[in-house]
Each structure stands twice: as structure tokens, then as C-alpha cells.
């Protein structure tokens, strides 16, 4: 009887953890999709005026895509490095995975969208003939920084669980 109760709780904990993983990967991917679309739309418009700057536009358009990779990296850490996504997961571990998923997912979502907007403004300026590629890259790093901080927090939380 005790085994079936603990097995039942283990299933609940696994589900809770995987909801966190889904939020982490899903929201970060959605943010990246929006961010690269915002920058990509600006690139199409800017190419009409300055088609020789396509390489710059490509780099700035791809930049918001990194947040989606951070969501996947968070999942990979919990699955492979920390090894907490197992049938023996505890309630504390599941709650930590859920919390990490919400935190990283939301930060990546919003930072990717805002980064896409920064990149789009730089793309528009480059399209008008202004030499602002380097400046745009520097300013686009600021939203990225917060996604990196959220990924680092996810790493630290996972490290604490694995210890």
C-alpha cells in the first residue's frame, strides 16, 4: 500500500516538473518566434532601401532566437546534467523545476520580444543609411542579459537539487 501511494505521488511530481519544463521551453520558444519575426519584418522593409546590408540584418534578426535555445538548455540541464526528471523525483525537486520553468520561460519570452524590437529599430536605421550596426548589437545585449541571468538561476537551482 505504501508503495502505491508513493508511486502515485511520484507521478504527480513528475507531471508537475514536466509542466515546468513545458512552460520553460514553450514560452522561450514563443518569445524567440515573436522576436525574430519582429526583426525579420523590419529587415524586409529595410532591404527595399539598402539591400547591401543583408548580412547585418540577418545577424540582428537571428539575435532574439537565442532565448529559445536557453529554454531548451534549461530542460537539458534538468534532464541530463542534474538527473532530477526521474520516477524518484521528490516534491521539492518538482516544485523547483516548475518554478525554474516559470521564471526562465517568462524572462525569455519578454526579453526575446523586447530584443526583437531593439533589433528592428536598428535594422530600420541601417536601412536608412545610418551606420548603427555595432551600437544596435550593444543595445540588444541588454534584454539578452536578463535571459542569461534566468538561465544561470535555473542552473543554480538545478545544482542545488542535484547536491
Per-range role (PLM):
Residues 21, 93-116:
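Short alpha-helical packing/oligomerization segments
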Residues 152-163:
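Juxtamembrane boundary at the C-terminal end of a transmembrane helix
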Residues 62-97:
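Helix-adjacent hinge/juxtasegments
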Residues 11-19, 52-55, 89-98, 131:
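Membrane-interfacial loop-to-helix junctions in multi-pass transporters
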Residues 52-60, 129-140:
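Membrane-interface alpha-helices at helix entry/exit sites of multi-pass transporters
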Residues 1-13:
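Single conserved hydrophobic/aromatic residue that forms the stacking wall/gate
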Residues 63-71, 139-151:
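Membrane-embedded alpha-helical segments of transport systems
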Residues 33-52, 112-132:
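Juxtamembrane helix-loop transition segments at the membrane interface in multi-pass membrane proteins
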